[in-house]
């Protein structure tokens, strides 16, 4: 009996017919996780590119506005109709955001935050050239999460994470700059283990192209999308 058992064990030990199945059972879950994770990584990269494109496009549309202000013709002017159009253009630039919002059963404006601002720089120094110290002041700001009118925006390292209270050091200088901040809530398809969406934030800074400054002009029917800073 003992000899028969030993012989059976020896035969079983030499058998390799089920090795592939056992190996597959170990490897399959890992491969599945990598495949699903790869899909979300690709979606994240695409979403990042689209958020950057939204910020760039809106900033460019504002910066090239050369309609003269009725109060100061040397400046360009935008009104609530212009800025509402620029804001809503995100639906065309980033249509996947609409699908994501529908999947979350929320309005698309709750899935992405778009803020548009004009910042003017001043200095009390004269004939200082490259050594001038400039103080930024928000002239107007509007959208989903307006920048604060005060205190003055803080100078930050150029590679810093975008913040509504800071500006990159490189944009400090004479004149003004248009600032567009975009924040998107990325929801992974297969990331149900992540309790909250992953935020993607991008900010773009462009100087007005044809006018020294773009001011906000209140017209009849103004919907309050923008607040002017004192």
For the regions a language model picked out, list residue spans one by one.
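Short, cationic low-complexity segments
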Residues: 223-230
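Context-gated lysine
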Residues: 7, 50-53, 110, 211, ...
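Intrinsically disordered, low-complexity regions enriched in Pro/Ser/Thr/Gly and acidic residues
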Residues: 95-201, 205-208, 215-222
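Alpha-helical assembly-interface signal, strongest on the long, hydrophobic N-terminal helix that forms
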Residues: 1-95
């Amino acid at each position: 009996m003992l000899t028969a058992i030993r012989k059976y064990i020896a035969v079983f030990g030499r058998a390799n017919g089920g090795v592939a199945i056992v190996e597959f059972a170990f490897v399959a879950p890992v491969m599945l996780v990598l495949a699903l994770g790869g899909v979300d990584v690709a979606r994240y990269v695409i979403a990042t590119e689209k958020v950057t494109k939204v910020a760039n496009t809106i900033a460019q549309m504002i910066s090239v506005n050369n309609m003269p202000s009725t109060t100061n013709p040397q400046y360009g002017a935008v009104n609530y109709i212009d800025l509402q159009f620029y804001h809503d253009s995100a639906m065309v630039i980033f249509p996947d955001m609409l699908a994501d919002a529908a999947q979350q059963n929320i309005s698309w404006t709750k899935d992405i935050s778009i803020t548009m601002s004009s910042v003017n720089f001043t200095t009390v120094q004269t004939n200082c050239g490259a050594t001038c110290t400039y103080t930024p002041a928000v002239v107007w700001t509007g959208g989903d999460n307006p920048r604060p009118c005060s205190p003055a925006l803080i100078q930050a390292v150029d590679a810093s994470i975008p913040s509504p209270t800071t500006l990159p050091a490189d944009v400090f200088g004479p004149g003004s700059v248009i600032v567009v901040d975009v924040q998107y809530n990325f929801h992974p398809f297969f990331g149900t283990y992540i309790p909250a969406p992953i935020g993607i934030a991008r900010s773009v800074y462009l100087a007005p192209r044809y006018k020294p400054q773009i001011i906000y002009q209140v017209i009849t029917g103004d919907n309050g999308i923008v607040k002017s800073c004192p």
